[in-house]
UniProtKB/Swiss-Prot annotation:
PANTHER family: 50S RIBOSOMAL PROTEIN L40E, LARGE RIBOSOMAL SUBUNIT PROTEIN EL40. The gene is rpl40e. One of its GO terms (cellular component) is ribosome. This is Large ribosomal subunit protein eL40. InterPro entries: Ribosomal_eL40_arc (IPR023657), Ribosomal_eL40_dom (IPR001975), Ribosomal_eL40_sf (IPR038587), Ribosomal_zn-bd (IPR011332). It comes from Thermococcus gammatolerans (strain DSM 15229 / JCM 11827 / EJ3). Belongs to the eukaryotic ribosomal protein eL40 family. GO terms for molecular function: structural constituent of ribosome. Keywords: Ribonucleoprotein, Ribosomal protein. GO terms for biological process: translation.
């Protein structure tokens, strides 16, 4: 994806809330907006395909 590791770390070292979709910092235990504990890492590969 990114051309160098620093950029990749800046883009992908984030957690996404599975309830509200908010972006959270990497070390978070719960969502900053809704308090939900179900966080996933940001996807490195696109899903779907646009069709």
């Amino acid at each position: 994806m990114a051309r160098f590791p620093e950029a990749e770390a800046r883009i992908f070292r984030k957690l996404i809330c599975m309830r509200c979709g908010a972006t959270n910092p990497w070390g978070a235990k719960k969502c900053r907006k809704c308090g939900y504990k179900g966080l996933r890492p940001k996807a490195r590969e696109p899903r779907g395909g646009g069709r």
